[in-house]
Amino acid sequence: MEREKLTQTINDAVESLREELVALACDIFAIPTQNPPGNNYLECTAAIAKWMERIGMEVEFVDVPEERLAELAPHGEGLPRRSVIGYLGDRNARPNIHFTGHYDVVPEGTGWSTDPYGCEIRDGNIYARGSADQKSGIVSELIAAWALKKAGIPLKGTVIASATPDEESGGQAGVGYLVERGYLTKESTDYCVITECLDVDKVCIGHRGTLWFEVHITGKQSHGSMPSEGVNALVFAQKLMNVI
């Protein structure tokens, strides 16, 4: 199939899935998955899995063992951490392309004029927590896979879509755990796209990453009449923060 005709066929399939796209988006936008601590993760992954199955994808859940939650999700209050992976085509076929995004969201905060989990649609826009960062990326993954299947595009390999937790707190229990388990490595993955909320013309390579650490700064006490003999730990803490 010629490239232009192929592109048009896929675009037509995407357009035909507009109602499904909105339904999928509102289905998962309505689930409050605030992190920390990591609310409703099992409910959200179950909803995503339902849509994957509707598309015809093979579905797999990847759970962080309970005994490792304190290590990988120290801010998670012991709540479960689960990723969900969908495979379109033979999961072992190569080459493969893995689209991945996170379903956790930061707390909604204040100042909303709409219900942050009400999925209000106005003037062609969906207003909800996660509609940008970053459940919309997961919606894009699934609609792309669905469009390929609906258009009848033969696959030479596998399209993989995953939804992971905990990006907002470092990702160790999410995409980091998929890497640890071998689901997303240079050996198992030919191509990978992180479906973060950038425009289509801003596909980029790399990520600034994140580090969580705890620093202890020790001062030296002194009498108020002889402050020069003491060491103010706050002064050195400020210097450290300026460097960071």
Language-model features: locations:
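Acidic/His- and Gly-rich active-site-bordering loop/insert found
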Residues: E2-I126, K150, P154-L155
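Predominant activation on well-ordered alpha-helical scaffold segments within soluble catalytic domains
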Residues: C26, A49, V139-W146, G176-V179, ...
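Short alpha-helix boundary/capping segments
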Residues: E58, R129-S136, S225-A233
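Conserved hydrophobic/aromatic beta-strand scaffold that supports enzyme active sites
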Residues: S83-Y87, C192, E214
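Glycine-rich, phosphate-binding/catalytic loops in enzymes
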Residues: T114-G118, L178-E180, T210-L211
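Acidic/histidine-rich catalytic neighborhood of metal-dependent amide-processing enzymes
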Residues: I126, Q134-R208
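Acidic-enriched catalytic cores of C-N bond-cleaving enzymes acting on peptides and small amides
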Residues: I205, G224-I244
